[in-house]
Amino acid sequence: KTRFEGAPGTNPEELIGAAHAACFSMALSNILAGEGVTDVRIETTSKIGLDQDAGGFTIKTAHLTTTVSGNAEPSVIEAAARKAETGCPVSKVLNAQITLEVTVV
């Protein structure tokens, strides 16, 4: 849910989510290329969980959902995705619980 309540616009948290999804996808693509897997399609979204406490708002969670199709074994894609989850620079900078859901098609 955006802070703009139906009006056009994007808030900083949505931009962080978009950056996280893009960074993860790029990291996953790079890791797979290192494994010799180059014919893939990666689509990733990130859902940011924003909580309010006495000190203000805090990003508590980031949930990545990625769908990968291509010429690799699902186990190779899964392993690369787990590595990308913790290895992408945006994941490293977030002080939040990061979860990942991978679908291989």
Regions found by a protein language model. Give the residues of each.
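Extended beta-strand/beta-hairpin segments
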Residues: 1-18, 22-105
